[in-house]
Amino acid sequence: RQDDINTRSNTINYLSGSSVYNPNQPGLGVPLEMTMALHSDAGCSKNDEIIGSLGIYTTDFNNGKLNSGIDRYASRDLADILLTQIQKDIRLNYQSPWTRRSMWNRNYSETRLPAIPSTIIELLSHQNFADMQLGHDPNFKFTVGRAIYKGILQFMNSQHGKDYIVQPLPVSNFAIHFGKKKNTLELTWKGEDDPLEPTARPREYIVYTRIGYGGFDNGTLVSKPYYSVKVEPGLVYSFKVTAVNRGGESFPSEILSAYKAKRERERILIVNGFDRISGPAVINTPDRAGFDLEQDPGVPYLSNISFCGVQSGFNRTQAGKEGEGSLGHSGNELEGMEIAGNTFDYSFIHGKAIQAAGKYSFVSCSDEAVENGIVTLEDYPIVDYILGLEKEDPATKAYYKTFSSPMQRLITSCLLY
């Protein structure tokens, strides 16, 4: 274990050695500016209170200096910025009383040995039920990941005295329409502003294209939320869109597909209503607490490798204990296994079935595009509505109702049309 812990820091020093940030050690000259170790902590609350986040840094080493000559208290600044951003974003996104525990100036290998600013962030307690209700949620993981990214960005730019720009959020309301010109498709979407970060506005977009079962191309840069493309009849085309600015590129949109039949008889609309990503089913009673993977293992973003096994210890009185029977104890049957999640690529699967059926063309869209009037159901004689594992779950913060109230009204109107 000591070799493992020390190797992390020594690897950083070897990579950054001979760079401007670590000029006094031999190495590969990679200009690494800081290092952060993301940990989970132990500890539990019997009253379902949040344990929260802790930051660790070390100043009492190398005469209080880092190898570039700056004060080791730069590591404290890094920890402070990260904890502030994590707490702020979690509280605003989840209305959760997320706790900022403290900052420890202590002698830990991962914060003592690196020659550059370094911190350990103990994000949450893996032993605490309240923390893990959020910790298993892929939406929470995205929020935390983005908060950490923003915190690192703030720290690095403050060291250089420069302003920063945060990469945009993913686009929404993605839709494919049949073009006005022969054998063309028109793609539309909406760029999203980040209410937590005014610099994250999208400036341009990249449209990625896939033909059939091939891979996506390197993308086409467009300045507006619109893209027209000529297609070859008989081939299924798939698209995904990212937003970009000077800060970087967003996560991709869902993948939508379209197909122009060679001898078109009719046109079909595929609506992707499967947006859900979530943690496993929650058990929360006065006597029992935990996660029921057998009832519902949740829906990871793409996939998940974080489960050891099915939970067997649910007794609240055994919180804080270890071993069989303790709260949170599980089997090991899922160790090393990858759990399938939401690929956001199901209009292609449904579309291939439509292609095989004969002379039917199709386009696809997000359910938000229908709800917001961008796509009209009445324009299509057949609508294929994908729901997958979509469902409403009171235990989760995100809203994944299968048919929202606006969608219910639109479907009713379409059926009466």
Question: Where is each model-derived feature located?
Answer:
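Pro/Thr/Ser/Gly-rich low-complexity, intrinsically disordered linker/stalk tracts
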Residues: 155-199, 233, 248-266
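Active-site-adjacent mobile loop/cap segments within catalytic or ligand-binding domains
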Residues: 19, 35-65, 93-162
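Short beta-strand elements bearing conserved aromatic residues within extracellular beta-rich modules
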Residues: 203-207
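Beta-strand-rich modules
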Residues: 228-249
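Aromatic-Pro/Gly-enriched surface loop or interdomain linker
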Residues: 255-381, 386
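Short beta-strand segments within Ig-like beta-sandwich modules, predominantly Fibronectin type-III
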Residues: 217-224
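Catalytic-core regions of hydrolytic enzymes
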Residues: 1-51
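Conserved small/polar residues in nucleotide/adenosyl-binding loops
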Residues: 417
